[in-house]
Amino acid sequence: YPTEGIYGIGCDAFNQKSVDKVITIKGRSASKSFIIICSDVIQLNTIIDQDYMNYKELLAKDFITWIVPAHKKCPSWLTMKNTVAVRITSHPVINNLCKGLDGPIISTSANYSNHSYINDIKKIEALFDKKVDYIVEGALGGEVKSSTIKNIVTKEVLRK
């Protein structure tokens, strides 16, 4: 599916079997966490610590993924060191996908682990066609890279 900057692979964040399938498809370590994308902050209700639900940075829908303390009810496969990586999307395709699912998705770049991301939909289709359940059509947003990642508590930039 298209995002603001690159094509992604993802699934229902609360479906551990589907998350495991994404890990297998990418050849990715299960110890690496995913970015969680949602259409609005309400979809983060059981994912992030309630103290951070109304942070203006999180609500801005900028192309920034925030590392936020995890909610105590957040599934363990979504957390790393009691934190989660979350982004409220402004991309219409992903926004509608999350709304239709009525919840967040995990997201990772459409490539094999430790390879460069691919922004050619034909190459992505050739690479993943028989491995994924569905390829969502749509244009990329106006960004030309992966999202910036920042820690919401320390404001440290982890990826530019």
Each PLM stretch: what is its role?
Residues 2-160:
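Active-site-adjacent structural elements in enzyme catalytic cores
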